[in-house]
């Protein structure tokens, strides 16, 4: 026993002999280690730090590292618990054959060292090899210039080795703790230990139905983006609780109902499948719920990020309809100086275009105003209170006519209205000022907005008679109506040439002379942000998919070993191999596709809420999101079916004793 090299050799033999268990375990550990290194590399990369919009990318990659850290811990602990459960009989035999617990502990230490070395070294090697390819993909998605060269992140390698070294140490401590508390006889029989038939817990079924229904109702009845944001995590929590309750208690109730149906139950393929699932449903239900939740996470994460990226051009056109929007605040400007200041701002814009050698294709200006009102009944109150929070934008008839070419003549109490998410009567009030709707319009001038997330619940665009009406509204607003002079410009030339026009204006913007909102400048930032969203969404989707596949694989292996003796007995009492295969197919179909169908239902129920959340990022194209969600579901189903085929063969080989 004291010969050096005995335990290292025995540990290596054990790992190779149990390759069916340790192979997927080490592959998953290595893949998560590679993913963690790649995200660390992108977080600390000098190449990423040098590109425009680096702050967005590095923040997103850091967030991704946190998610991968959490899932790596869960994945390793889950896989380790499965592997050790399958090996308990083997460890018990070691004790019966003369090995003491301290010897078994040494064996576990060596096995953990081998696993850690293989996973960390393999993961780092794969991460280093793939890091440049992933970086090029990220830069391409973000519309950033491709940087050539190769670098290795030593800090990323150190972080990866430290994290996974700690996780393997944690699994070792857990395994040793279980070994110390066990007895040899328990280890010999634990792998085949069954469970009592679970009872039908009606209270849990009711709780699951109520929480799932409440989560669905919350998602289906949400009316505006900010309410969706406020209740999103509550809805997620309710659906998760409902899923676990119904899979745990509801599945048992369903199986017992099937057992009480003689026409269905007393068929060999159904009899063995239902009886087996019912006997071990407590364990199976949690695994099925985990698969369902992870599948839902994959579908939601990938579909939302893909749709955001696909709808980016539309969002840019809505947020930045002009190449350049120069904004001069008039809040602190005396009325007698407004004309001079406005003319000076207009001259600066024209001079910048001349200096850049650009032809001005569109030049227009106006003096809009905006405030926030809270609509109740037929009145907007300009002090925060209960009511529909509404962004109110004001434009005089003269400015509206100059911008649109439509001449309008309004009385002081008349307005033209364009409303979004708001229904108004023919006469409404702003504080005590009455306004009569003289007509509705659909062409209220748009302005560039530097705000990514949408503003208030509703928007109201008003064309008023003249500045006296704006002043009257401002007098009733404690915070005053925000007034500004805006110059919109469209230019000829390439994107780079338009950015060159913006640079001197941005320099003046830095001195607080005025603010400049550039379509091209913000397009760079948004492509960086949305490209990072898409990259991270797909990256995390792969992580969730890996977790799903691993749980499915281990679950089916566990089922196969537990069913092996049962099916052998069934063949001995008269079942044909064809009947055995049919019964296996019936059980595997139920185990596999119930979580997938449920995940699809979850996504369908969440669709209205997700649409509202996407509106916060200026994605209003519901059809686009529906297509992206459907495409994601189809791809996921194809992968799911592939895993199903592979797992069915593995399950069949185990049951057949191969």
PLM feature segments, named:
Residues 1-33, 197-202, 211, 246-295, ...:
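N-terminal Sec/SRP start-transfer signal
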Residues 1-6, 181-195, 561-562, 652-658:
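Short cytosolic juxtamembrane segments of multi-pass membrane proteins
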Residues 20-27, 35-67, 82-85, 93-94, ...:
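Peri-transmembrane interface segments
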Residues 35-63, 233, 249-252, 285, ...:
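Alpha-helical transmembrane segments
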Residues 41-54, 124-156, 214-230, 595-657:
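Short helix-loop junctions at transmembrane helix boundaries
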Residues 114-258:
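Hydrophobic alpha-helical segments
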Residues 315-546:
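Basic-flanked hydrophobic alpha-helices used for secretion and membrane insertion
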């Amino acid at each position: 026993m004291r010969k050096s090299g005995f335990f290292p050799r025995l540990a290596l033999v054990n790992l190779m002999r149990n390759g069916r268990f340790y192979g997927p375990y080490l592959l998953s550990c290595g893949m998560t280690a590679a993913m963690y290194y790649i995200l660390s590399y992108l977080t600390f990369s000098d190449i990423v730090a040098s590109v425009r919009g680096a702050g967005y990318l590095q923040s997103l990659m850091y967030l991704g590292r946190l998610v991968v850290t959490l899932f790596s811990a869960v994945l390793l602990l889950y896989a380790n618990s499965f592997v050790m459960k399958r090996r308990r009989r083997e460890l018990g035999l070691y004790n019966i054959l003369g090995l003491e617990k301290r010897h078994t502990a040494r064996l576990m230490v060596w096995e953990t060292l081998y696993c850690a070395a293989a996973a960390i070294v393999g993961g780092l090697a794969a991460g280093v090899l793939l890091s440049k390819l992933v970086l090029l993909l990220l830069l391409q998605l973000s519309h950033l210039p491709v940087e050539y060269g190769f670098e290795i992140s030593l800090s990323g390698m150190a972080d990866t080795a430290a994290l996974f070294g700690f996780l393997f140490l944690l699994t070792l401590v857990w395994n040793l703790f279980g070994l110390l508390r066990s007895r040899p006889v328990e280890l010999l029989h634990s792998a085949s230990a069954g469970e009592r038939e679970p009872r039908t817990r009606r209270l849990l079924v009711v709780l699951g139905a109520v929480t799932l229904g409440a989560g669905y109702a919350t998602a289906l009845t949400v009316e505006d983006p900010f309410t969706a944001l406020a209740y999103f995590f509550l809805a997620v929590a309710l659906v998760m609780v409902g899923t676990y309750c119904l899979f745990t208690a509801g599945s048992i109730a369903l199986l017992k109902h099937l057992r009480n149906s003689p026409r269905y139950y007393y068929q060999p393929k159904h009899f063995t499948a239902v009886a087996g699932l019912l006997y071990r449903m407590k364990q199976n239900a949690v695994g099925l719920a985990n698969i369902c939740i992870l599948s839902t996470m994959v579908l939601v994460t990938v579909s939302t990020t893909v749709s955001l990226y696909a709808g980016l051009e539309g969002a840019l056109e809505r947020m930045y309809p002009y190449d350049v929007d120069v904004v001069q605040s008039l809040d602190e400007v005396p009325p007698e100086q407004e004309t001079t200041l406005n003319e000076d701002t207009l001259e600066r814009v024209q001079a910048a275009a001349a200096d850049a050698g650009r032809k001005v294709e569109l030049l227009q200006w106006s003096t809009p105003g905006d405030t926030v009102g809270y609509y109740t009944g037929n009145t907007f109150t300009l002090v925060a209170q209960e009511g529909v929070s509404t962004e109110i934008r004001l434009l005089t008839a003269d400015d509206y006519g100059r911008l649109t070419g439509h001449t309008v003549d309004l009385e002081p109490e008349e307005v033209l209205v364009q409303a979004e998410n708001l229904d108004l009567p023919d006469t409404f009030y702003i504080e005590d000022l009455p306004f009569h709707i003289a007509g509705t319009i659909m062409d209220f001038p748009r302005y560039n907005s530097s705000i990514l997330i949408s503003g208030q619940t509703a928007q109201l665009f008003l064309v008023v008679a003249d500045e006296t009406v704006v002043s009257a509204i401002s007098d009733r607003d404690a915070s005053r109506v925000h007034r500004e002079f805006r110059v919109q410009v469209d230019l000829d030339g390439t994107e780079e040439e338009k950015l060159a026009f913006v640079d001197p204006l941005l320099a003046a913007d830095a001195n607080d002379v005025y603010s400049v909102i550039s379509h091209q400048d913000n397009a760079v930032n948004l492509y960086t942000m949305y490209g990072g969203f898409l990259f991270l969404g797909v990256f995390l989707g792969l992580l969730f998919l890996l977790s799903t596949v691993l749980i499915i694989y281990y679950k089916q292996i566990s089922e196969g070993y537990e069913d092996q003796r049962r099916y052998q007995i069934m063949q001995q009492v008269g079942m044909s191999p064809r009947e055995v295969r049919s019964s296996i197919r019936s059980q595997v179909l139920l185990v596999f596709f119930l979580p997938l169908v449920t995940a699809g239902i979850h996504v369908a129920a969440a669709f209205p809420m997700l649409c509202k959340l996407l509106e916060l990022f200026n994605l209003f194209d519901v059809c686009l999101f529906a297509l992206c969600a459907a495409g994601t579901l189809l791809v996921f189903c194809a992968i799911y079916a592939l895993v199903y085929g592979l797992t069915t063969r593995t399950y069949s080989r185990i049951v057949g004793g191969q």
